[in-house]
Swiss-Prot record:
Role according to the record: Involved in pre-mRNA splicing.
Keyword terms of this UniProt record: Cytoplasm, mRNA processing, mRNA splicing, Nucleus, Spliceosome
Subunit structure: Associated with the spliceosome.
Subcellular location: Cytoplasm; Nucleus
GO cellular component labels: catalytic step 2 spliceosome; cytoplasm; post-mRNA release spliceosomal complex; post-spliceosomal complex; Prp19 complex
Gene Ontology terms: biological process: generation of catalytic spliceosome for second transesterification step; mRNA 3'-splice site recognition
Origin species: Neurospora crassa (strain ATCC 24698 / 74-OR23-1A / CBS 708.71 / DSM 1257 / FGSC 987)
Protein name: Pre-mRNA-splicing factor isy1
Domain of life: Eukaryota
Family of the protein in this entry: Belongs to the ISY1 family.
Lineage, broadest ranks: Eukaryota, Fungi, Dikarya, Ascomycota, Pezizomycotina
Length: 239
C-alpha cells in the first residue's frame, strides 16, 4: 500500500508540475533553466531565471576566493563564471526584447541578487578573484596597470620629453642674431604681404561698409618696416 501511495503522489506531483508550467507558475529554484532563451515569452519567468543565474555567479565568485583551490580548479571556475555571465546577458537581452526593464543600462557593472557589485564583471572575458593571480594573467594586469600610469602621468613630470628640447626651442639659438637670416626673413615677410595685397586688390568692400573715422591703414612698406623694428628691439632686449 505504501508503494502504491508513493506512486500516486509522484504522479500527482508531476501532474501539478505540468499544470504549473502551463500556467506560467514556475519555481525557479527547483526547475532547470531552459536552454532556448529566445523562445521564452514571459517576462516574470525570464526575471526568475536571470535571478537564478545571478545567485550562481555570486556563489562561484565567493568560492573562487578559496585559497585551497588549485590553479586548474580556479581556471575551470573562472570559465564557468564567464559562461554564466554570457547567459545572464542573453536573459537581459530577452527581457528587453519582451518590453521589460533594460538591465544592460548600468554601464557594464554586474550586481548580484542582493544588489552588491561583482568585481570584475563587464564585457568580454573577465578574471575574478584568485584568477587574477594565475601565472600569465598576473603579468598582463601588471603591464596594463603600468601602461595606464604612463598615460596618466603629467607632462611636467616626463623628463623624456624635456630632454629632447634645447635652447633653440626657446629662441636662444646662435643663428637667431645672424644678419643674413634677418634679411632673409624680412624679404620673405615683405613678399608675403605683397602677395596678400595683390590677392586683395580686386576685391571690393562688402555693401554697407564704412571706413573708421580718423583711421588710416598703413602701407605694406610701413608694416614691413614695423616688423623689422620689432624684431630688432627683441634681439636687443635679449642681449
Amino acid at each position: 500500500m505504501a508503494r502504491n501511495s508513493e506512486k500516486a503522489q509522484s504522479m500527482l506531483f508531476r501532474f501539478r508540475e505540468a499544470q504549473a508550467a502551463d500556467l506560467g507558475i514556475i519555481d525557479a529554484g527547483r526547475t532547470r533553466r531552459p536552454r532556448s532563451i529566445t523562445e521564452q515569452d514571459s517576462i516574470p519567468a525570464c526575471e526568475k531565471w536571470r535571478g537564478q543565474v545571478l545567485k550562481e555567479i555570486s556563489r562561484k565568485v565567493s568560492r573562487i576566493q578559496d585559497p585551497a583551490l588549485s590553479d586548474y580548479q580556479i581556471r575551470d571556475l573562472n570559465d564557468e563564471i564567464n559562461k554564466l555571465m554570457r547567459e545572464k546577458h542573453m536573459w537581459e537581452v530577452q527581457i528587453r526584447n519582451l518590453g521589460g526593464p533594460n538591465y544592460m543600462r548600468s554601464g557594464g557593472k554586474v550586481y548580484d541578487e542582493a544588489g552588491r557589485e561583482i568585481p570584475g564583471g563587464g564585457r568580454g572575458y573577465k578574471y575574478f578573484g584568485r584568477a587574477r593571480e594565475l601565472p600569465g594573467v598576473k603579468e598582463l594586469f601588471e603591464a596594463a596597470a603600468r601602461a595606464k600610469q604612463d598615460d596618466e602621468k603629467p607632462l611636467e613630470t616626463r623628463d623624456d620629453l624635456r630632454k629632447q628640447v634645447d635652447a633653440a626651442y626657446y629662441g636662444y639659438a646662435p643663428d637667431e642674431e645672424d644678419e643674413k637670416l634677418l634679411a632673409y626673413e624680412a624679404a620673405r615677410e615683405r613678399q608675403a604681404f605683397e602677395n596678400l595685397a595683390k590677392a586683395a586688390a580686386g576685391l571690393e568692400p562688402p555693401p554697407g561698409w564704412e571706413p573708421l573715422p580718423e583711421w588710416e591703414l598703413p602701407t605694406m612698406d610701413e608694416v614691413a618696416q614695423e616688423l623689422i623694428d620689432r624684431r630688432r628691439r627683441r634681439l636687443l632686449d635679449q642681449l
